[in-house]
Every structure is written in structure tokens, then in C-alpha cells.
């Protein structure tokens, strides 16, 4: 049955062709079924309604183009974002039919663009113009429909359509069965592209979807069962495939989980998610299998995503993905979030459950997260999540992030950025501080060879790192270690033995320090003195005492600017660096408080605060509100501004060190300031 033989014409109006095509569909169905052919050429039409036993076949080169004439889309029973209502007829619609098909190499064009349907979403990006666009979602239709559903307003009283701004789907089959959509290309949908609702036995095969419009989901089976989606290409403005089962009250009343769904051999490009469960998922979802797919786009946000909240409720279980190759995605390879749309106006307390989710043999070259799970705060309802034999490279922010209440989240041979991700219970240490400390000790068995050294080295790097190790030891000693081995305390004692090795190797009995030259007046070489001082307080020795006196003497005699601030080094004459403040002053303050009489200690602390304040005045840049890393009082260095002497550069490292210098100097000051006769205003000035 070729439509041109039954009244349809390429030069006819959309209304005329709509009438001819719908009349032919009814005739063929009444005769027991058959194939209706859309021949090569462009055929404008309004909404058409499929009937049982009818195949709509688009020949190669045929374009079935739906006109932007809202009056050609009469009210029908449908659902909009998971809520039952009467709304504009989808472009191709069916209700309570069976054995229908859309096939062929032709194109179905929904006519969506910024001058037609898309502007109705109320976003200027899609053509909406305040005061010009007459029909749009900003008129409150979406919120009104949501409230009707929340309040239990009967379905037949929820009438929208003309003047309400709720855009129609491209293809929407309702309460139908045995459906085939094969080989066609679908473009420019007003809203969701393919939306089977409360249907079963559906095959979508070889379909190409190109739709960059708002809410342009590719294929959204809702409350459907026995669905096969294969060999398809999705380039969408929203989720490529989003499995749904009704929103809130309506989904619970339908009580029809989407289930038994296979997705295979598909390619996903742009879109919010590759394979998505939710968020209109109140009826639940089970038995989803996605495999052998390719996904790649800087705009594709997630690969497998489950999104829901405690307005929805529902049980989501048995969701499996395997053998998927990903070039890049924008956010996460696997994301489960139970706080989707946290400000949604709805009745809450319907806690959803997500369980038995697996991802296996999935690779990804770039993403912000590998696995991102956001559980609920009240109920432990995300559990039995298994990621196995996956390899994610180029992960920028965090390999795995799991928050909220979860249980049995397992990583089995998950490699992220070249490193094996361990389950929390499988980690040798439950805290990163202990784990990192022992990892470093294993990597560099001799503490004096840290910083990739080939021979014993005196360096600020060693001092900074070993102070962190010392803090770890002090925090976890006395049976507090999280080591899972047989002897946790002995394992912790290994830290302090490692730290003892450094002063023993680097300082001889006369207090001479290997690699240190007093005459260099190098502040970098003083930083490690703070570590030595802390170790000396725990394990006093004559050699350390002598070395500390030498290092303090250096600071007493350190060359200074005319304003009294330390030069960074003798070879960096007249230069003040933020680095140097951190390298020298914390030891300067700590040593003074611990070893000098109160009046002398006060003088040292006042001097330290004065240097910090003057450094602030000389390095702060009003334009950027950051501190330049250095200042040259002669204004002659190649890096110095000739007018004010400030460096051209701001170093993130130096900013951090400058703040830590102030913090550590404050820590050195006793709580009872009267003990060293320091005034509170001096301390407040530093704060």
C-alpha cells in the first residue's frame, strides 16, 4: 500500500497527508494487516496513529516530516515525564494495539528546532523569547501536572495539549505489544524520541537517532517488558537510553517494573547518559543487560547511570553491563545517585533500593570519576554493586567516590590510572595516612634516600615528608593502628624506626650535617630542622642538640633586607620568597619557645610575626588578590617588576607554604602567652 496511491501528495498540506495516511492505516488494519509504504521524497504530515497488524515502511530517500502545527496533534492518552495525562498526540502514536512495525531506510523528522517545538522548553538557548514565545513550559504546566499526580487527581481530569507547552514525543506506543522499529533514522524530535509505555515484546534494531534538542532522549521504554535494543546509533540532547517505570504516585499505581531488557551492539555519542535507569522509576526496574557497545564523546556525561530519589521508591535490581568500550565521558563511568532532583516538590519517604548492579570488562580513556555512588543518608539501600575486570584511564578528579549508606560495593581487578583499586575491607590499612606512609617506606627502604636520591641527602623534602610520617606514628601508636596484619603495633613501630634512621645517618657525633653548608645561608636547608627538633624531643641526643644549635645560629645570622626580612639564600641576595618564610620561621619559633628564656623567646616570636607581615605587604597583589612568590628589594632581578619588585609569578605551592608557615608559627606560641610575655595583639596580628 503506497501512500501516493491513496491520496497523499508531496505538495499537499500536512493536514491533507495526515488524513490520507491515517485513513490508509485504518483500512489496512481492518483488512487484516499489511505494509504501508512511504516512497522516496518528503511527505509533510501531522500526527498519525498506528493500528494493529500494520507495518509503516519508509523507502530509502523517504522523509516523513511532521509539521509544526499544534492543531494537527489532537489530545490522546499518554504520559509526560512519567505522569499519566491527556496531551498532544505524539508524531507517531498507538494505543492498545499489537503487531505493529516501523521499518525501512528512510527518515522520520519530528520538525524540532529553535523556531518550532524546542523553544517551548523555556530556555533561550533553544530559541525561547520572553514575551514572544506564546506557548512554553514556563507557563507552569509541568508543575501543575506534577501536583495533580501528587494529589491523586484522576487521569481523565489531567488534560493539557493546546496552549500548555508540553511537547509531544516522536514515537509513543501505549499499552501495546509485539512492536518492531527497524533501520529508520529519527531526527529532530520535539521531545523524547522513542517512548514505548506499558508495552511488551519490543524490538528496536538498527535505528539511528540524531536529536540535539532539549529532553531529547533516544529510547525510553517505560514500564515495559521484553525489550531488545540493538545495532543502534544514538546522538542525543539527553539520555541515549533511559529506562523508566512511572513517576511517584503514578508509577506506584501502575506497579509495572521495566524488566527483561537487552541492549547490545549500540553506539552512543552525545547525551547525558549512555544507559540510564530513571529517574521516573517508581515502578522499579529489573533484569537489564547491556553489552558490546561503544560510547565516546566529550559531551556524553555517564556510561551507566541509575538516578532516583525518595519521592520515587521502587526496587532497581539485576542491572548488568559488560564489554563496553568508552573513549571519554564527562563525569563518571558508573554513577548511582539517590539524591536526583533534591528540590523536587513531592511527598517523600519512599526510599528506593538499588541492588545487584554489575559492570564487567568496560574500558574508558577519560572521565572525571571512575565510580561515583551517592547513597542515601538514612537507609542502607544501595548494595551488592560489583565492578570487575575494568580499566579506566585518564580519571581526573577521583578514581572512586562512595558516599551515603552503602553495603558490599566490590571492586575486583578494577584498574584506574594504572593502579589497582582495592575494596575498603581489603586494604592493608583503613586510613590513607598509614597506607601512604608504609607505601613510601616500602618504595624507599632507607629514609635518607627519599626524594629519588642516589646518596644520603639533606633536603627540605625529607623534613616535610617525614614530619607527616611522624604525625601518623604519633596518632596511631598505642594500639590505634588500622593495619590488618597480625601485629599492628610492631607495624606502627616500623615507622619510628624508619624516622630514627635519618638523623642517625645524616648527623655525626659532633653535630655536623651531611650536605649542609652554614655559609650558604640557605633557608631551604633549615626546614628539616623542625623534623629533627621534634625527633630530638622524643629521643634526645647530643648530636641532634649540636646540629639544632647550628641551624638556629644560621637563622640568627641570616642576611636580611633593609626591612629585616630574611634573604632566601646568600646567592639570592635581597630576595624574599614565600617559600623561605615556610622553610625558616616555624623552626625559628619552635626552637625559641622550647630552648630560650621567655624574654628572648618573645623577641624571636615578635621578629617572626614582623617578617610575615612585611612579606605580606611586599608580595600581595591587589589585582589578583593573591601573593606573588617573591620580592626583590633592588627591583633588578629579571623576574622582578621594575616598579615594585614583585615577581611576575604566583606559585600555588608557595601560597600553601605561606599559609602553613603562619599556622605553624601560631602553633608554636603557648596557649598561656604570659609564659613568654608575648602580647595577644601580636598573635592576633598574625591570625
Name what the model sees in each region.
Residues 677-687:
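Single conserved hydrophobic/aromatic residue that forms the stacking wall/gate
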Amino acid at each position: 500500500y503506497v501512500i501516493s496511491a491513496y491520496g497523499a501528495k508531496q505538495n499537499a498540506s500536512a493536514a491533507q497527508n495526515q488524513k490520507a495516511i491515517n485513513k490508509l492505516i485504518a483500512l489496512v488494519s481492518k483488512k487484516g494487516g499489511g505494509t504501508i509504504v512511504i516512497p522516496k521524497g518528503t511527505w509533510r504530515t501531522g500526527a498519525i496513529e498506528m493500528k494493529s497488524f500494520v507495518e509503516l515502511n519508509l523507502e530509502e530517500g523517504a522523509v516523513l516530516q511532521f509539521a509544526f502545527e499544534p492543531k494537527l496533534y489532537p489530545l490522546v492518552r499518554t504520559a509526560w515525564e512519567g505522569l499519566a495525562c491527556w496531551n498532544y498526540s505524539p508524531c507517531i502514536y498507538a494505543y492498545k494495539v499489537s503487531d505493529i512495525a516501523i521499518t525501512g531506510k528512510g527518515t522520520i523528522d519530528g520538525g524540532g528546532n529553535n523556531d518550532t517545538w524546542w523553544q517551548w522548553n523555556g530556555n533561550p538557548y533553544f530559541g525561547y523569547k520572553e514575551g514572544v514565545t506564546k506557548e512554553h513550559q514556563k507557563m507552569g504546566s509541568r508543575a501543575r501536572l506534577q501536583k495533580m499526580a501528587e494529589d491523586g487527581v484522576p487521569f481523565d481530569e489531567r488534560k493539557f495539549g493546546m496552549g500548555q507547552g508540553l511537547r509531544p514525543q516522536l514515537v509513543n506506543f501505549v499499552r501495546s505489544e509485539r512492536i518492531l522499529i527497524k533501520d529508520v533514522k529519527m531526527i529532530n524530535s520535539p521531545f523524547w524520541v522513542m517512548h514505548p509505555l506499558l508495552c511488551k515484546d519490543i524490538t528496536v534494531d538498527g535505528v539511528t537517532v540524531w536529536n540535539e534538542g532539549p529532553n531529547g532522549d533516544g529510547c525510553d521504554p517505560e514500564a515495559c517488558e521484553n525489550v531488545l535494543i540493538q545495532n543502534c546509533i544514538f546522538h542525543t540532547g539527553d539520555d541515549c537510553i533511559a529506562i523508566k517505570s512511572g513517576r511517584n504516585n503514578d508509577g506506584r499505581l501502575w506497579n509495572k517494573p521495566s524488566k527483561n531488557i537487552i541492549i547490545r551492539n549500540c553506539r552512543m555519542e552525545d547525551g547525558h547518559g549512555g544507559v540510564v535507569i530513571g529517574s521516573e522509576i517508581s515502578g522499579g526496574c529489573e533484569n537489564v543487560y547491556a553489552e558490546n557497545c561503544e560510547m565516546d564523546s566529550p559531551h556524553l556525561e555517564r556510561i551507566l547511570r541509575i538516578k532516583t530519589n525518595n519521592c520515587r521508591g521502587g526496587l532497581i535490581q539485576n542491572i548488568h553491563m559488560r564489554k563496553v568500550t568508552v573513549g571519554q565521558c564527562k563525569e563518571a563511568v558508573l554513577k548511582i545517585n539517590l539524591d536526583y532532583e533534591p528540590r523536587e516538590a513531592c511527598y517523600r519517604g519512599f526510599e528506593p533500593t538499588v541492588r545487584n548492579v554489575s559492570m564487567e570488562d568496560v574500558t574508558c580513556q577519560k572521565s572525571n570519576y571512575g565510580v561515583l555512588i551517592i547513597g542515601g543518608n538514612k537507609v542502607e539501600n544501595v548494595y551488592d554493586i560489583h565492578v570487575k575486570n575494568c580499566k579506566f584511564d585518564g580519571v581526573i578528579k577521583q578514581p572512586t567516590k562512595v558516599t551515603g549508606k552503602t553495603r558490599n560495593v566490590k571492586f575486583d581487578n578494577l584498574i584506574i590510572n594504572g593502579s589497582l583499586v582495592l575494596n575498603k575491607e581489603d586494604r592493608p590499612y583503613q586510613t590513607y595516612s598509614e597506607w601512604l606512609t608504609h607505601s613510601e617506606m616500602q618504595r624507599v627502604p632507607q629514609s635518607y634516600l627519599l626524594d629519588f636520591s642516589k646518596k644520603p641527602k639533606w633536603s627540605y623534602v625529607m623534613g616535610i615528608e617525614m614530619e607527616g610520617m611522624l604525625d601518623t606514628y604519633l596518632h596511631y601508636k598505642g594500639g590505634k593502628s588500622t593495619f590488618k596484619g597480625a601485629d599492628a603495633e610492631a607495624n606502627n613501630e616500623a615507622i619510628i624506626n624508619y624516622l630514627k634512621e635519618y638523623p642517625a645517618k645524616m648527623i655525626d657525633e659532633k653535630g655536623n650535617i651531611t650536605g649542609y653548608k652554614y655559609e650558604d645561608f640557605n633557608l631551604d636547608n633549615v626546614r628539616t630542622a623542625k623534623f629533627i627538633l621534634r625527633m630530638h624531643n622524643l629521643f634526645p641526643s647530643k648530636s641532634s642538640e649540636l646540629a639544632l644549635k647550628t641551624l638556629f645560629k644560621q637563622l640568627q645570622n641570616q642576611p636580611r633586607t633593609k626591612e629585616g626580612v630574611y634573604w632566601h639564600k646568600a646567592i639570592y641576595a635581597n630576595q624574599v620568597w614565600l617559600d623561605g618564610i615556610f622553610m625558616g620561621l616555624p623552626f625559628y619559633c619552635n626552637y625559641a619557645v622550647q630552648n630560650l628564656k621567655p624574654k628572648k623567646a618573645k623577641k624571636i616570636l615578635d621578629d617572626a610575626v614582623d617578617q610575615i607581615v612585611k612579606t605580606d605587604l611586599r608580595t600581595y597583589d591587589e589585582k589578583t588578590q593573591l601573593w606573588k612568590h617573591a620580592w626583590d628589594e633592588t627591583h633588578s632581578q629579571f623576574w622582578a617588576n621594575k616598579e615594585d619588585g614583585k615577581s611576575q609569578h604566583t606559585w600555588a605551592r608557595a601560597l600553601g607554604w605561606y599559609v602553613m608557615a603562619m599556622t605553624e608559627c601560631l602553633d608554636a606560641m603557648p596557649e598561656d602567652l604570659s609564659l613568654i610575655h608575648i602580647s595577644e595583639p601580636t598573635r592576633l596580628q598574625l591570625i
